[in-house]
Design a protein with these regions (language model features):
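Short beta-strand/loop element within the Bergerat-fold HATPase_c
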Residues: 159-171
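Short helix-loop "hinge" at the ATP-lid/N-box region of the Bergerat-fold HATPase_c
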Residues: 152-153
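Primarily the dimerization/phosphotransfer
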Residues: 18-52
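Conserved micro-motifs of the catalytic ATP-binding
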Residues: 91-96, 133-136
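Short conserved segment of the HATPase_c
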Residues: 184-196
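Conserved signal-transmission helix
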Residues: 2-26
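Conserved catalytic submotifs in the C-terminal HATPase_c
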Residues: 98-99, 118, 123-133
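Short alpha-helical segment of the dimerization/phosphotransfer core of two-component systems
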Residues: 68-76
Length: 215
């Protein structure tokens, strides 16, 4: 009936409005968090420069504080790059899905992080088939794999092993990256895909994470 159609239309409109409100709230929270993340390194950088320019006690070693300032700038640059990437992927650009050799994608990303694991004398135990085809958005998938690999290496102690397995079970591809270091607490798991979320903010600041790797 016309009444039922009107009720259905009203319910759909209400649902759409609630979704839009939720998205807007996410945007507000995202930019608020982004502002905070940029403000902290800027404050540190300003303190270093002010101390050196004004000859404040403790800042006599300019080389040391210039190196620290450069590290802060590097962190800010990485964060800005991540923000630009997120802005791009949340825009009007459509994802380009295509069939790729997923095993080869994994191997390429492993090669990009090999220097990092060698520095810590870690052993990567890799079990990946010769070929494994699937349809993915390659750029975003490469980024996600690299972020997980880098985190596994960063948060594992030196001289430890990291197990990497890729397999296909009943038509579903399963990738596993298991390290022997710091584990994510159970209560943090639901938040892993939130912007800027870090299970331990102080620990992640020391290792250079932005909290956008899985967003």
């Amino acid at each position: 009936t016309a009444l039922n159609d009107l009720q259905i239309a009203n319910q759909q409109l209400k649902t759409d409005m609630e979704k839009e409100q939720a998205l807007e709230q996410q945007r507000v929270e995202f930019f608020s968090a982004a502002s905070h993340e940029l403000k902290t390194p800027l404050t540190i950088l300003k303190g270093h420069l002010s101390g050196m320019l004004n000859g404040i006690s403790g800042y006599e070693n300019n080389t040391e504080y210039m190196e620290r300032s450069l590290a802060v700038v590097d962190r800010m640059e990485n964060l800005v790059k991540e923000l630009l990437y997120v802005s791009k992927t949340e825009g009007t650009q459509k994802s380009a899905y295509k069939v790729v050799d997923f095993a080869e994608v994994f191997r390429v990303q492993l090669a990009t992080v090999s220097d990092l694991s060698e520095e810590k004398k870690q052993h990567l135990e890799v079990n990946i088939p010769d070929r494994l085809y699937c349809e993915v958005e390659q750029v975003q998938m490469e980024r996600a794999i690299q972020n997980i690999l880098v985190n596994a290496i960063r948060y594992s102690p030196s001289n430890e092993s990291i197990h990497i397995t890729l397999s296909e079970i009943h038509g579903t591809i399963r990738g596993e990256i298991e390290n022997t270091g710091v584990h994510v607490p159970d209560d943090a798991l639901p938040h892993l895909f939130e912007a800027f979320y870090r299970a331990d903010a102080s620990r992640n600041r020391n290792t250079g994470g932005t909290g956008l790797g899985l967003y």
